[in-house]
Each structure stands twice: as C-alpha cells, then as structure tokens.
Amino acid sequence: MTINRWHLLVSGKVQGVYYRASTEQKARELGLTGWVRNLPDGRVEIVAEGEPLQLKALHEWCHEGPERAVVDEVAAQELPATQEFTDFRTTH
C-alpha cells in the first residue's frame, strides 16, 4: 500500500462556512489522516496522508466543499509521507 502526503491551500469564501468541519468529515470517510486549519489570510490549509485514490477524491471534493463555500482555487503540493498522524482533525 502506497501512502502519499498532500498539502492543500484552499482560497475563496472558505472560512465561516463549515469548511474545516466538512473537510474533517470527508477525510475521515476516505480513511485519511492529517489536519485542517484556518489561516489568518482567509485560506484553509490541509495536510492529508493516505492512499493516492483517496487523496485525489479529497482534492476533488475541496473544489466544491460544503454548500455555503465558494472555492476560488485549490493549490496542491505532494510531499513525502511521514505517517505521523493517527487520525484526521481540525487544528487551530
């Protein structure tokens, strides 16, 4: 089983619309580990680890997000996996 790590930066109307909570729920459904947090500049940052197909599914979902979100851009970067996470959670 191949484990990858993706770093995602989501911009648009993504704070105050349950984007973090929805991302956490979606990532857990996909069996991913990592975290999601709001950034001071209004973006949402995500670090997720898991199988490539599940990471791709999360990346695709991030372009839509929850119902009230308006996503302008999702920047993705693949990084070496560290497998340091045991679950997926919202951080501050």
UniProtKB/Swiss-Prot annotation:
EC number: 3.6.1.7
Keyword flag Hydrolase: yes
Reactions catalysed, as given in the entry: an acyl phosphate + H2O = a carboxylate + phosphate + H(+)
Source lineage: Bacteria, Pseudomonadati, Pseudomonadota, Gammaproteobacteria, Pseudomonadales
PANTHER family named among the record's database cross-references: ACYLPHOSPHATASE (PTHR47268:SF4)
Species in which this protein is naturally found: Marinobacter nauticus (strain ATCC 700491 / DSM 11845 / VT8) (Marinobacter aquaeolei)
InterPro entries in UniProt: Acylphosphatase, Acylphosphatase-like_dom, Acylphosphatase-like_dom_sf, Acylphosphatase_CS
Domain Acylphosphatase-like: 5-92
Active-site residue list: R20, N38
Gene behind the chain: acyP
SUPFAM superfamilies: Acylphosphatase/BLUF domain-like
Keywords associated with the record: Hydrolase
Any one GO molecular-function label of the UniProt entry: acylphosphatase activity
Name of the molecule in the record: Acylphosphatase
Family: Belongs to the acylphosphatase family.
Domain of life (superkingdom): Bacteria
Enzyme class per UniProt: hydrolase
